[in-house]
Amino acid sequence: MRITLIGPGIMPIPPTGWGAVEILVWDTKLALEKLGHQVQIINTKDAKQIINDINSFRPDFVHVHYDEFIPIVPYIQYPCAITSHFGYLERPQMFNGYINVANEFVRVKPNIFCLSRGIQKIYNVMFDIPRDNTYVTPNGVNIDEFNYVDDPEYPDRSIYLAKIDYRKRQHLFQSIDSLWYAGNLADDRFNTSKNYLGEWSKDRLYNELTEYGNLVLLSDGEAHPLVCMEALAAGLGVVVCEWGKANLDTEKEFITVIPEDKINDIEYVEQEIVKNREYSIKHRDEIREYSKKFDWVEVLKKYYLPSIEKVIAKHGS
């Protein structure tokens, strides 16, 4: 198949540093090519150029990875779906200005590739988008990129790897001595003098993540965060917020969910982080094996390509 992937046009693809959507688009391209498909990436904010580039390529399918491009979707003449990576999709009370984008989704009623069943339900119930227009297509991870060791250099450290901002809430947990932070800084409440590792490059992420005991992600909103799968691929257990558990098997002892009503109980949070870390460093092979279900090639074969085929079939009917 000939497949067009449309990025936000904000950062380069592949990204040189931060950029979860950009690395998702790039890794999707690599995995699709591994399976024999031809892939075009369009990464510009210019709507006319997007349409012209699509028409020049004449794809079998177009996947838009930026929800603010929803007004363009009706002008795409090929089978098409759009994915939102907005972190508050499952928390409509946090939409604020996003309501304008949401209203466009209600108007256009596009095909939507949803990152989780919870997000699919929001589109079906709140947005009144027909179930037949929504498809669950989880994110994957390029497992082979990640260094993996059985004995990490910092088994007594947990890492909070994310952009340091208001949604991620890192500043709340800085009294936890064993918790370290990596990410670009966008929150003046965060104290950079304590356990701050700076912003990591992609190479550092791939090479050094495995040296920590486990990953912590306690945001007040998420949409199937890539960093959780990256951590699993590196052999780390994960401690996540309620919205970070999408597509994870929460019965696994190396996956811990902190209820939102306990998020300010720092003593409880610390105990759960330490408990998860102590289990995780002894069961790295189990974690690494579990991560293989999120390998991009497996995700594409199980979810993504069957969903594309359904959209194409519907387009022709």
Where in the sequence are the language-model features?
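Aromatic "clamp/platform" in nucleotide-sugar-dependent glycosyltransferases that forms part
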Residues: 220
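Conserved donor-binding/catalytic core segment of Leloir-type glycosyltransferases
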Residues: 113, 150-180
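A charged, aromatic-enriched C-terminal amphipathic alpha-helix characteristic of glycosyltransferases
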Residues: 260-268, 274-315
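Acidic anion/phosphate-binding donor-loop and adjacent secondary structure
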Residues: 92-93, 124-125, 138-156
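Short hydrophobic beta-strand element within catalytic cores of glycosyltransferases
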Residues: 237-241, 247
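Membrane-proximal helix-turn-helix segments that form the acceptor-binding/catalytic region
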Residues: 88, 93-112
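A short, active-site helix/loop in glycosyltransferases that binds the activated sugar's phosphate group
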Residues: 106-133, 141
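Short beta-strand->alpha-helix junction loop in the catalytic core
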Residues: 118-119, 136-146, 185-187
